Amino acid sequence: MEVIVIGSGVIGLTSAWYLAKEGHTVTVIDRQDSSGKETSFANAGQISYGYSSPWAAPGIPLKAMKWLTQEHAPLKVKPSLSPELVAWATKMLANCNEAKYAMNKSRMLRVANFSRECLTHLRTSEDLAYEGRQKGTLQVFRSEKQLDAIQQDMKLLTESGIEHSLFDVDQCLSVESGLADVKDKLVGGLYLPHDETGDCHQFCLTLTEKAKQLGVRFVFDTEVVSLNHQNRAIETITTTQGEFKADAYVVASGSYSRELLKQVDLSIPVYPVKGYSLTLPIVNVDKSPTSTVMDETYKVAMTRFDDRIRIAGTAELAGFDYLIPEKRKATIDMVIKDLFPQAGDFSKAEYWTGLRPMTPDGTPIIGKTPIKNLFTNTGHGTLGWTMACGSGKILASVVSGSASDIKSDDLSIHRYL
């Protein structure tokens, strides 16, 4: 079959890769001049299988109200509430109970765990270089209340077969010795030994070249204008470079998937949740993270690459806005200076912002749509890098009509229709 994939971020690329591996003729179309230039460009760098959790959780509505009044809170909401945001937030609030949280987290862990297997195989078989490390994630807690709250997550991790350990402060220092000078600020941590790190943009560029060797065609600097459909099927797509025709079409356009799918009367609850990152060159290796350290209080991740640190966090509900206010810079600055004050060179700081495509239940939307030759792979939120390889392989199986390696029928758009 001929398949067109719309989007060359990490989700579109892994979709294209696994489709090509199944023997399809694949064309990837993207509006940027190369792969991974939007949400995949400077994300947190953490590949956190065990940290795969929905934001819609018990207690979040109350926490959100408190966060809105705090200077360095992990959540920000722009004053003007659009109808799309109100509808999305309403659905999210409906998922903030114990039963739905457990169901959603279980689904997310299923995809994430499968993705770990897929990435391991892909990295090994193709010898991919992306500054990858397999040294785990340490989620650090600053209060006893946070330690108590993590018990429910640990139960779900156990049920999903994901190895984890609750650490005291000394054990935290055994895996992240760079925290030694600030140990009095911590009460413990959750260690996930099988989590990984890596530069997502480097991965995208490397996989693009590998995909070309499989025969995948890339069409850059080209924006999809319309999906032309008749009799519940896509016939062609119109782009800024003319029309393209295929047997099947995959929408993997992140936060922009929602607008594309509106053209075929499909409404998906994917909202752009804005996040910020800071990249610093390392000046003191001994005072830097070894892998990923996640500050539970501020929801900020600090990830080690070869000679850089990537600090990322904040969830801002502001629509399709790419401005970087000084206040947002101040929050991620504050966290890295608080926990790893001697690690990086702030005179060479690089700031970035991206839009994470978030669903109300946290689970991505992968699979068939009511349009018979149209498929989706979107809605991964902050976990696109974590879930990319597994999601791409699931998507390829669905398009091919073959059995998926894991249960995937509850991942499609149909759960929202």
From Swiss-Prot:
It is an enzyme of class 1 (oxidoreductase). It catalyses: a D-alpha-amino acid + A + H2O = a 2-oxocarboxylate + AH2 + NH4(+). Pathway: Amino-acid degradation; D-alanine degradation; NH(3) and pyruvate from D-alanine: step 1/1. Gene3D superfamilies: D-Amino Acid Oxidase, subunit A, domain 2, FAD/NAD(P)-binding domain. It holds the Pfam family DAO. Its EC number is 1.4.99.-. GO terms for biological process: D-alanine catabolic process. InterPro entries: DadA (IPR023080), FAD-dep_OxRdtase (IPR006076), FAD/NAD-bd_sf (IPR036188). The keyword Flavoprotein applies. Its cofactor is FAD. Oxidative deamination of D-amino acids. Belongs to the DadA oxidoreductase family. This is D-amino acid dehydrogenase. The gene is dadA.
